Amino acid sequence: MTNGAFITFEGIDGAGKSSHIDALAQALRAAGHTVALTREPGGTPLAEKLREMLLHDSMDALTEALLVFAARRDHLRCVIEPALARGEVVLCDRFTDATFAYQGAGRGFDLEVLSYMERLAQTGVGLQPDLMRNPDLTLWFDVPPEVAAQRLSAARAPDRFESQPVEFFTRVARGYADRAAGAPQRFARIDSSQPREQVAAQLRAVVAARGWLAQTP
């Protein structure tokens, strides 16, 4: 794959997306692809430091958004764009859709301001100076917020986002639905309320339909 591929995993906390990233990476490698695994916020030394601040320090929505896009710019420049230029498949746990869902829909931050930050941070970091980088495919793990909350309660100690009330995640889920409606060619909805094996089958079918894996008979 000479041009690489950029695949993002999205969904509210507790949707179960992160547990499927490694399995997809293994399947893609078995199919002959070189795969880069990364996450947001994070992926570089600078972005990981900003991640720690975002997850554990108290701040308002504007500060969150500024830190997220600063981390994203560094991540694109240092990790994502170089990997794509090498023809790799980049699997990223969250990207800009999460910012619109969490800071936009969840926190109520101005979507027009987020769009401006998006253009500023994501333009001119690749081979084409006027290109705004977006994913080739976004796998949206959709689950009722109540189900996600039950999963989180049984997991590790929650961070600042995971400890938000169900009402917050209901707004975030609506934000993801709005993003999916606005980019139907890029988004693929995965019903992650189903058992793990069925979720994995949905995931593989979507990726196979894009030509990155063999179709399952």
Swiss-Prot record:
Tell me the keywords, alphabetical order.
ATP-binding, Kinase, Nucleotide biosynthesis, Nucleotide-binding, Transferase
Catalytic reaction annotation: dTMP + ATP = dTDP + ADP
Provide a GO CC annotation, any one: cytosol
Pfam (any one): Thymidylate_kin
The record's family statement is: Belongs to the thymidylate kinase family.
- Role of this protein: Phosphorylation of dTMP to form dTDP in both de novo and salvage pathways of dTTP synthesis.
| Species | Acidovorax sp. (strain JS42)
Q: Which cysteine pairs make disulfide bonds?
A: none
Top-level enzyme category: transferase
Q: What is its EC number?
A: 2.7.4.9
Q: Which SUPFAM superfamilies match?
A: P-loop containing nucleoside triphosphate hydrolases
Tell me the residue numbers annotated for binding ATP.
Answer: 11-18
Gene3D superfamilies noted in UniProt: P-loop containing nucleotide triphosphate hydrolases
**A GO BP annotation:** dTDP biosynthetic process
| Domain of life assignment | Bacteria
Recorded hits in CDD domains, A to Z, give: TMPK
Its Gene Ontology molecular function terms? ATP binding; dTMP kinase activity
State the name under which the record lists this protein.
Thymidylate kinase
